[in-house]
Amino acid sequence: MKKRVVKVDSVEDRSKYWEGADILVFNTYVWWMSGLRMKALWGSFGNGESGAEALDTPVAYRLGLKTWANWVDSTVDSNKTKVFFTTMSPTHTRSADWGKPNGTKCFNETEPVKDKRFWGTGSNKQMMKVVSSVVKHMATHVTVINITQLSEYRIDAHTSVYTETGGKMLTAEQRADPMRNADCIHWCLPGLPDTWNRILLAHL
């Protein structure tokens, strides 16, 4: 398991920047997908990782979302602030998902998947259900914007080898090794995220 610890019982470090906003748009997913289990921490960081408990990722995700939901319900004035939650942004790191077992992740893909039923291994339906369950029980109205299915088709829309690492664009040598360096998580701009924004604007 990678050394990633999530503090699931507090949003204090970030929430001070959210207070009083007219529109709040939340999302969280990729950083949770480091494995089947994740270290979760309650209370102080004083004990470091020794105070963390390894939980199934969906369980830790639910705990974190419940903490967020409690903050929204106790702090946000729904007469002033509109709250949105966008669902997971898919990753496309396994070309066998779309019928190319000998492919190189999303590298050199130039067209979307045409199968309307397509759902790759880069999106976790169990995590989607966690979002729906938590939001359904909130006192504050939260509009869930489902970007996942429409984004699943766009294996062609990632930055691929035209990306950066450590703040620098990939070198020619790095671009020549797409199996190692192709970025099939982030998206090109202009591109698919503009569609997400159009959906958001339609709700405003």
Predicted regions and their residues:
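Extracellular glycan-modifying ectodomains
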Residues: M1-L204
